Amino acid sequence: MSVEFDQLIKSHLQTGGVYFYNTTDSVRAERTGCETFGYGYRVMNHVMVSDRAFQLDTERWRRVLSGYTIDGIKMFPAETTEGKEKFDRIVALPSALDDKTTPRGALKLESCDSLLRRTPPATLITDDNMGTEWRWPLLGRE
């Protein structure tokens, strides 16, 4: 992930297309995605970003997730308490949008606008500075 890679992804997306990726909890990676694309959300330790503002369709999300399978195994089996609780928690994410009382590590949805206001300015990740790939192992910091 870097400004240059985000720009490459943007060039392959249709206008309004959405890119979703893992930021490994790096605030610099989150800010890089939000600043490069301009619109989006942090979803736990991922960002979902676009060149256009977009709204989350919770009913569509509910329908898609209820049928979601991996290798034929239902990810949210409604017949188990655990599956139902997981499903309800994830489907409820949009209701907690930008909720300042939710701890950072919790299941959370935050708009890019909120993220950029909440976090201190940081050097964006580029192909030349490699972000945490170089800083963390060598310096122990982001």
Predicted regions and their residues:
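Short, glycine/acidic-rich beta->alpha junctions
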Residues: 1, 24-25, 41
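A short glycine-rich, Lys/Arg-flanked "PGG" loop and its adjoining helix->strand segment in the class I
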Residues: 1-15
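Short hydrophobic alpha-helical module
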Residues: 15, 36-39
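Conserved beta-strand signature within the Rossmann-like core of class I S-adenosyl-L-methionine
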Residues: 16-23
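Extended hydrophobic-aromatic, low-complexity segments
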Residues: 21, 30, 57-59
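Short alpha-helix
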Residues: 23-36
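Soluble small-group transferase modules, centered on the S-adenosyl donor enzyme superfamily
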Residues: 39-142
